[in-house]
C-alpha cells in the first residue's frame, strides 16, 4: 500500500488492455480480398483439414481468416467480410469470414443455426 506522498510522486499506472483482433481497428467487421484460399491442419489432439483464407483488408492488414461451415465457393480475388473471433486449434487464425455476405455464399441445406451460416429459411413442403 503506497503512501500519499508516493502516489503524488508516481501516480497510478493504468493497465492497457491488448486487442485480441488488432487488424479490425475497433470496427465490428472489415471488407477484404482473398489472396490465398487453402486448408491447414489443427493443433495436437485434433485432426482435420480446416479451410482458411489469407485476406488483405481495406485498411492494408493481411490476416488469416477461418471459413466456417461445410463447403464454400471462395477463390482468390473473392471479396469477403471479416469479423473477429479466433479458432482455438489453429494458431495464428484470429478472424472469421462472414457467411452469406458479399462473395461468400451461405451453407447449403443448413436447417439449424442458419443465421450463423448465412442460410435462407427452407421453403415449406
Curated annotation (Swiss-Prot):
Species annotation: Leptothrix cholodnii (strain ATCC 51168 / LMG 8142 / SP-6) (Leptothrix discophora (strain SP-6))
PANTHER family: 30S RIBOSOMAL PROTEIN S12 FAMILY MEMBER (PTHR11652)
Protein name: Small ribosomal subunit protein uS12
Record GO cellular component, one term: small ribosomal subunit
Highest taxon above the source species: Bacteria
Biased composition (Basic residues): 113-125
NCBIfam families attached to this UniProt entry: rpsL_bact (TIGR00981)
InterPro entries, sorted: NA-bd_OB-fold, Ribosomal_uS12, Ribosomal_uS12_bac
Coiled coil start-end: none
Amino acid at each position: 500500500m503506497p503512501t500519499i506522498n508516493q502516489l503524488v510522486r508516481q501516480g497510478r499506472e493504468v493497465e492497457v488492455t491488448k486487442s485480441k483482433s488488432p487488424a479490425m481497428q475497433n470496427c465490428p467487421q472489415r471488407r477484404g480480398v482473398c489472396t490465398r484460399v487453402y486448408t491447414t491442419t489443427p493443433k495436437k489432439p485434433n485432426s482435420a483439414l480446416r479451410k482458411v483464407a489469407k485476406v488483405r483488408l481495406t485498411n492494408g492488414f493481411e490476416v488469416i481468416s477461418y471459413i466456417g461451415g461445410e463447403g464454400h465457393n471462395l477463390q482468390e480475388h473473392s471479396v469477403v467480410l471479416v469479423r473477429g473471433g479466433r479458432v482455438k486449434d489453429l494458431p495464428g487464425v484470429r478472424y472469421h469470414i462472414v457467411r452469406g455476405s458479399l462473395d461468400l455464399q451461405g451453407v447449403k441445406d443448413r436447417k439449424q443455426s442458419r443465421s450463423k451460416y448465412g442460410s435462407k429459411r427452407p421453403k415449406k413442403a
